[in-house]
Amino acid sequence: MLQPIEARCLSSLPGVRHGFFTRGGGVSGGLYASLNCGPGSSDEPSHVAENRARVARHLGAGEANLITLYQVHGATALCVEGPVTAQDRPKADAVVTRTPGLAVAVLTADCAPVLLADPEARVVAAAHAGWRGAAAGIIESAVAEMERQGAQRERIRAAIGPTIGQGAYEVGPDFEAELLKGCAGNEKYFLRINANARARFDLPGFVEGRLAAAGLAEIERQSPCTYENESIFFSFRRSQHRKEADYGRQIAAIVVT
């Protein structure tokens, strides 16, 4: 049984369904147990297909109407009006639609999934916001594409899903320098336990800051850390620290009914 996390600011909207899905309720095994929705993983393709079908059914969408992207940690947002197969998914990091019954989604395993909706224009979006994409402007690109489809930013509600927490996100000096280059205000997203320690980066806070700067109507942030909650979430960083061969991807999706 699927039990996605829902954001209050989106679940209260008529005609919009969404979910930040956890790793539970699927058919995959091993490293991918159990709701791995990533076609780019080395999981059994039939398992990934069944997991994605379960998500689509939960949202009331047809199995072919769950749209994900070939994510590249960039700032490209695009609009879709009809089904796109997992094999033909376009390279982008945010997807927008105003087509009823078409569920737009992103895959994550530590990066921030962001779901957005303008209930009046009936335009929804899903964005994949890692630090690189967020710094490059993926949030701003998603909002701009929503506006091209008739949304107004002062009506847009946004929810940030489960992301790696600051306590688990240790970064090196080059990372810090890149984020501070030309924007000293980003310093507030870095924390050091002591003067000699490596900084820890607040990715969900950084994404929330970009959403706030975009002037949206409401922003909600989910607090669970993907790294620290192994029974609930996949985590790329955790898999790297354990030298595991691969990792699963959880999905976040939104649809206009």
Give the label of every model feature segment.
Residues 1-257:
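Active-site microenvironment for binding and transforming phosphate-containing groups
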